[in-house]
UniProtKB/Swiss-Prot annotation:
<dbReference type="GO" id="GO:0051085">
    <property type="term" value="P:chaperone cofactor-dependent protein refolding"/>
</dbReference>
<dbReference type="InterPro" id="IPR011032">
    <property type="entry name" value="GroES-like_sf"/>
</dbReference>
<comment type="function">
    <text>Together with the chaperonin GroEL, plays an essential role in assisting protein folding. The GroEL-GroES system forms a nano-cage that allows encapsulation of the non-native substrate proteins and provides a physical environment optimized to promote and accelerate protein folding. GroES binds to the apical surface of the GroEL ring, thereby capping the opening of the GroEL channel.</text>
</comment>
<dbReference type="GO" id="GO:0005524">
    <property type="term" value="F:ATP binding"/>
</dbReference>
<dbReference type="GO" id="GO:0051087">
    <property type="term" value="F:protein-folding chaperone binding"/>
</dbReference>
<protein>
    <recommendedName>
        <fullName>Co-chaperonin GroES</fullName>
    </recommendedName>
</protein>
<dbReference type="GO" id="GO:0046872">
    <property type="term" value="F:metal ion binding"/>
</dbReference>
<dbReference type="InterPro" id="IPR020818">
    <property type="entry name" value="Chaperonin_GroES"/>
</dbReference>
<dbReference type="InterPro" id="IPR037124">
    <property type="entry name" value="Chaperonin_GroES_sf"/>
</dbReference>
<keyword id="KW-0346">Stress response</keyword>
<dbReference type="GO" id="GO:0051082">
    <property type="term" value="F:unfolded protein binding"/>
</dbReference>
<dbReference type="Pfam" id="PF00166">
    <property type="entry name" value="Cpn10"/>
</dbReference>
<dbReference type="GO" id="GO:0044183">
    <property type="term" value="F:protein folding chaperone"/>
</dbReference>
<comment type="similarity">
    <text>Belongs to the GroES chaperonin family.</text>
</comment>
<dbReference type="GO" id="GO:0005737">
    <property type="term" value="C:cytoplasm"/>
</dbReference>
<dbReference type="InterPro" id="IPR018369">
    <property type="entry name" value="Chaprnonin_Cpn10_CS"/>
</dbReference>
<keyword id="KW-0143">Chaperone</keyword>
Length: 95
């Protein structure tokens, strides 16, 4: 993928939501909620303070993260549906 986010932005791929319930019912696409969990694909270098000093990113490519339901901007890059969001939109890293 030939895309690198700038500054404190992060490129995230949502995890796939389940197609069936535990009881075996198939969930149609119109009834599915978009998951607020994803994997960091790439991230920028970080934000800068007024002094010009770089603030390092807390996340890195490969991290599994949780983010707000309405976070980010949906984009399609190389046929993949991804989200671009600021690092501050990420709520935490799953381990």
């Amino acid at each position: 993928m030939a895309f690198k986010p700038l500054h404190d932005r992060v490129l995230v791929r949502r995890v796939q939501s389940d197609e069936k319930t535990k009881g075996g019912l198939i969930i149609p696409d119109t009834a599915k909620e978009k998951p607020a969990e994803g994997e960091v694909v790439s991230c920028g270098e970080g934000a800068r303070k007024d002094s010009g000093e770089l603030i390092a990113m807390s996340v890195k490519a490969g991290d599994r993260v949780l983010f707000g339901k309405w976070s980010g901007t949906e984009v399609t890059i190389d046929g993949a549906e991804l989200l671009i969001m600021k690092e501050s939109d990420i709520l935490g890293i799953l381990s």
